[in-house]
Amino acid sequence: MTRTNQLTDIRTAPRRKVLISGAGIAGPALAFWLNRYGYAVTVVEKAGTPRSGGYPIDVRGTALEVVRRMGILPQLRDAHVDSRRFTFLDGDGGEVASVNPHTVGGSVEGRDPEVRDLEVRRGDLTDALYTAVRDDVEFLFNDSVETLDQPVQSSRSGRSSRSGHGVDVTFRGGGRRAFDMVFGADGLHSRTRQSLFGPEERFHRYLGYCFAVFTMPNTFALSHEIMMWNTPGRAAALYAVGDDDTVHAFLNFARPEPPSGALRDPEAQRDLVAAAFADAGWEVPGMIAAMRDADDLFIDVVSQIRMPRWSSGRVALVGDAAYAPSFLTGQGSSLALVGAYMLAGSLADRDHTAGFAAYEHHTRAFVTMNQEQIGEGDAALFPTTARALEQRNDMLRDLGTMPPRRDDRPTRPSPCPNSRSGGDSGHAVPSVASTRTRQAAGSADGRRTPTWCRGTPPWRGTRCGARPLGGAADRSFARYFGSRLNSEVDQK
């Protein structure tokens, strides 16, 4: 546990004490901005240290402006993954097309680093956030919130509310403390949300897929590239973020109902994934074997969190805890960064009641727009039927295949001799290729880009890696987001 004084505090009033549960992305980002606005911040995290490693994630659109204002953009640019090739394979392991990843992913790529989207390892982002704030706030590792108690306050009209005069927190480690506000930044399966709003099922929107992600030895000589195998309803991908001796492996499959029981048991999880890919070819059998032995395996369902409100009394939610968009949108990290920025800015000169209301008013439409990206590109990129798969492959070929690598490494892992292209219904979407549709029309060789890869990138100040909201909602978000910059300048 460390604590130092805030570098600069422009306020003369006593600093309000706040607790943030979760030290992933949203938590440290929120801590940074609340500290900037004069709050005394404590962050509690159940892990023993800041979590490192993790799969690649995107930082794009408005989130780029947030990290620039935090001063960590240069560090993230240095950590940029720079994927150079995306190879699509058919059910037999044969190459369908090899294209520029930015064409498929819809990211903004160009010579100007100010507008170029970033792809970094999750651990590189969390490390940058932690480093930016660790000397200015208190961190409690190896601990978590056990209970939250908001004293009930009665008004003159006889109505009761949870606003009270603070939040009494009991930690699992046995400590007890009082805070002016508490924030849940504890992810998709948030305990903070459950304690305040009830079971996760009330807000959980299952999207029809299950996925597994883990690392395995890079025995394929892959470098800065992605390889994805498809059959209807199933996808397997290998993602080499550099020249490392390991690659990220993804297995995704469609399932009509969430396998709730299997997710509670690690061995049942592995059996579930193995059964879904029992007849798969290419390198999938080897991936299944590696999954069995992986010590960093993560298996879950693809889902969103949708809530009618993000706060109760003096407690508010941010990031995945409030509005997880799912990895199918590619916006989870960016929404966490932008949401933290907007929440802190809303509290810069307001009490919790007015601040939480402003947070929702100015951010909700932006969140909804990003969550609704689901389904815009996945049907074309990850088809559910054999006919749709063939149509997708034809469109990929129209993009123009990149020339073969000039070295002597294999262009792809050798296909399994007994591979078959069968599969169950539905479709799966690995995070190595999210479904954004923002790439400008036209490919590098001048060929016409299919409509599912097309779309002019909107103004950076109004997007989070997606289309602008449009209309009053767009203007409201952009105006409020910009106003926070003026406030920051005034306080420096």
Model regions: which residues?
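Conserved mid-domain beta->alpha element of the FAD-binding
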Residues: I20-R36, A40-A47, F183-G184, L272-V273, ...
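Flavin-dependent oxidoreductases
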Residues: G208-A240, A262
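Conserved N-terminal helical subregion
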Residues: T2-S21, N35-Y37, R60-V213, P256-A274, ...
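C-terminal helical "tail/cap" subdomain of flavin- and related membrane-associated enzymes
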Residues: T2-R16, D78, G93-G94, S311, ...
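Conserved N-terminal glycine-rich FAD pyrophosphate-binding loop of Rossmann-like flavoproteins
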Residues: T49-E65
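FAD/FMN-dependent oxidoreductases across multiple families
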Residues: N218-T219, P232, G242, F253-T329
